[in-house]
């Protein structure tokens, strides 16, 4: 008899605690279905936003190398979804219908304007999704537009947007904060009563690859000589 790995998190049930975070592998139905078929208990759908969709660049990944070309970390410059809101919502509804026992959270990022949140929240809720994730952590591309980490770094904004979401949506609200802040506890304490929603501490952390000896990035990602 197999062990029971089922969980309940923020009122969301899942057959196991192994979920995929919002990222390129969760950006469309094809990828999410493959994850479910492989046994993943839940996914956070790649961040949705307002139309028109963001325009991503390629390549979106780079590696940080150590001695002997060992990969020590992966950096990405991916923005939010580059597909239309309509297509994403349609696929989310179909996937949830086909896989009702799996957790499906929808990551969201729209401007700090209440009407923008008031518009998108009912559309997401109508898909049958289990909850929403507020992306207050993206450190590249979106903060320049007043979203992502630009929100997570201001506790008053975190409180304001979370309150809007709890007002205009009945789904569980998960707040994903940015680590690119002096004291993350200030933002974590910001969500309004009746108690803070679950919060994920880390999105992406800003970094750059530099040589230990000398200055500037190593050519071609090469490590320092011995």
Identify what each model region corresponds to:
Residues 1-105, 109-114, 118:
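N-terminal capping/small domains of soluble enzymes
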Residues 219-225:
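Short, intrinsically disordered C-terminal tails of secreted or membrane-associated proteins
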Residues 33-38, 111-211, 226:
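Alpha/beta enzyme core
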Residues 214:
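Short polybasic linear motifs
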Residues 197, 217-218:
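Intrinsically disordered, low-complexity proline-rich tandem-repeat tracts
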